[in-house]
From Swiss-Prot:
EC number in record: 2.1.1.222, 2.1.1.64
High-level lineage: Bacteria, Pseudomonadati, Pseudomonadota, Alphaproteobacteria, Rickettsiales
Enzyme class: transferase
Keywords, comma-separated and alphabetical: Methyltransferase, S-adenosyl-L-methionine, Transferase, Ubiquinone biosynthesis
Family annotation (SUPFAM superfamilies): S-adenosyl-L-methionine-dependent methyltransferases
Functional pathway: Cofactor biosynthesis; ubiquinone biosynthesis
Protein name: Ubiquinone biosynthesis O-methyltransferase
Family: Belongs to the methyltransferase superfamily. UbiG/COQ3 family.
Positions bound to S-adenosyl-L-methionine: R36, G60, D81, L123
Length: 246
């Protein structure tokens, strides 16, 4: 079952050359990117004592806005995207900046099942895919036992409709009009329900809000609009028993 939304792909293909233009269609992502990177690294360091050999998977990597900064800090990153033009843009940037990133034009469904990662990242992607339940299940399938995942998306609330669509797209023009579809926004409780029968636990929910007075973005406990979800993959009791055998 494919997660690809062809309409969404066409929309992003038109602007895929512009990922690294801080004043372009992805400008808002550049403005929040330092927060996203800091949050990811904070959770990685919180969970792992040794981060030197971690394998990271960035799903729906776009032009490499997450993969590149992580690679620049020494992380081993594999980044995938369904769009060839996104991978081309990301690869060109990596080559220009002497970054080693394993970019692949593929989808989470097509990724080999036995490819497991210490950290799986999927930011601002879920609200653009089809078959979201299967997409999320495929996503967490690639987390190593005792590994973690960090995802972000937009809550389906009246406040999110107001700020995520009306204000962001039509008043302030932070993103192009029709970037988002309110019906595809996802409540945290819906993700929790999808993960109910898995060995994935939600470790933290954290909001990302815009402070109008200071003209800056910051992390918050307000998850009514944008939010991060920090996930952990539990090791089952059988695995623990096997690993404890001398």
């Amino acid at each position: 079952m494919s997660s690809i939304n062809k309409k969404e792909l066409k929309k992003f293909e038109k602007i895929s050359h512009n990922w690294w233009n801080k004043d372009g269609e992805f400008g808002i992502l550049h403005r929040i990117n330092h927060i996203r990177i800091e949050y990811i690294i904070e959770k990685i360091k919180l969970h792992y004592n040794d981060i030197s050999k971690l394998q990271i998977l960035d799903v729906g990597c776009g032009g490499g806005l997450i993969a590149a900064p992580l690679a620049s800090q020494g992380f081993n990153v594999t980044a995938i995207d369904a769009l060839k033009s996104n991978i081309e843009t990301a690869t060109i940037y990596a080559q220009k900046n002497d970054l080693k990133i394993n970019y692949l034009q593929t989808t989470i469904e097509e990724l080999e099942n036995d490819k497991l990662y210490d950290v799986v990242i999927c930011l601002e992607v879920i609200e653009h895919v089809e078959n979201v339940q299967q997409f999320i299940l495929n996503l967490v399938q690639h987390i190593k036992p005792n590994g973690i995942a960090i995802i972000s998306t937009i809550n389906r609330t009246k406040k999110a409709y107001l700020f995520g669509i009306i204000v962001a797209e039509y008043i302030l023009g932070w993103v192009p009009k029709n970037t988002h579809d309110y019906s595809k926004f996802l409540k945290p409780s819906e993700i929790y329900e999808i993960l109910t029968d898995t060995n994935i636990e939600i470790k933290e929910l954290k909001g990302l809000v815009f402070n109008l007075a200071r003209n800056e973005w910051k992390l918050s406990n307000d998850i009514d609009v944008n939010y991060f979800m920090y996930l952990g993959k539990k090791i089952n009791s059988l695995s623990n028993a096997i690993n404890s055998i001398p």
